[in-house]
Amino acid sequence: MNEIKTIKKGDANIDYGIIHGGEKAFIMLPGISLTSILNNIDAIEVAYQEILKEYTIYVFDHAMPENDDFSFDELIDYLIYAIEEIGIKKACIYGVSIGGMISLILSYKKPELIEKMVIVASAAKTNVERLKVLKQWEEMSNNYDIEVLNRDFFTTMFTSDYVSKNKQSLDMFIHNGSKHECECFSRVIRTMYNFNILDNIKNVNIPTFVIGSELDPIFGRKASEEIAEALGCDLFIYKGYSHAFYDEAPDFKHKILKWLNNK
C-alpha cells in the first residue's frame, strides 16, 4: 500500500510518498504543479509499474517555506535533510523540470547520495526571457486565475492530440487549486529565473541520462543539450512531443529502466 508521510524542518513541511516495489531506491523529484503531485500517487504507481519491479519509489513534493524569497539552496537543504532522515544511503535520482534542476544541484553538493541520475525536461541555465511560459503562469497565479492557469498549463504541457483525447480529465482538472497554492506556485516559479549552474556541474562524475524534447515550449531542446554537454553524458531527444513527453511517450519508462540496467 502506498504511504504519504511528512518530515518537518523549521517552518517547512517536507511531504513525500512511498510506492513500495523492489529493493533499490528511486527518488522522484517532480516538476512544478499547482496542486501536490502526491494527490496522484496511485496514478504514479500505475504509470511506473515497470520501474517498481526493481525499485521502491520515493516521491518528494517541493518543501514550501512561507518566506517569499526562498531559494534553491533551501530546497536542496530540505531534500538532503529528508533523504537522511528517511535513511536512504544511495539512490537513483529522477528529476523532472524543476526537479531536474534540484537533482543537478544535489549532484555536486551531495554526490555520495546518488548512484545514477535521470534528468528529464529540465535546464541548467535559464533567464526570464527564456522562460516566457513560466512568466505567464506566474502572472496568472498572482491573479488567482485558477481555471485559466490550469487550462493553459494542460494545453502547454501536452500535445494537442493528448489534450483532445483527455478532454474529460481536463474539465475535471481545471478547477483544482486554492489561493494559497497559487501563492506557493508563484514562489516556486520565481526561483527558476536567472538560474545558471552549468559551470558547477562540469566536474560531476555520476552516470546520467538526459532526456528532452525538441518541441518543449518551456525549456526547449537546447537546455537538455547544454546539460548533456556539460556532464558528457547520454542524451535522448524526443520528437513530436511537448514538455510532458514523460507522461505521453509510450516507451519512456522502458527507456529509463533499460538505461539504468545498462549503467
Question: What is each model feature region?
Answer:
Residues 108, 115-144:
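Flexible "cap/lid" loop of the alpha/beta hydrolase fold
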Residues 128-131, 147-200:
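Conserved alpha/beta-hydrolase catalytic His-Asp/Glu region
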Residues 95-99, 103:
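Gly/Ala-rich beta-loop-alpha elbow adjacent to hydrolase catalytic centers
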Residues 8-66:
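Conserved HGGG/HGGXW glycine-rich cap/lid loop of the alpha/beta-hydrolase fold
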Residues 204, 210-212, 216:
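Short beta-strand/loop motif that positions the catalytic acidic residue
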Residues 241-253:
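Catalytic histidine-centered segment of alpha/beta-hydrolase-like enzymes
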Residues 217-223:
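Conserved alpha/beta-hydrolase "acid-adjacent" motif
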Residues 43-45, 55-92:
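Active-site loop/oxyanion-hole signature of alpha/beta-hydrolase fold enzymes
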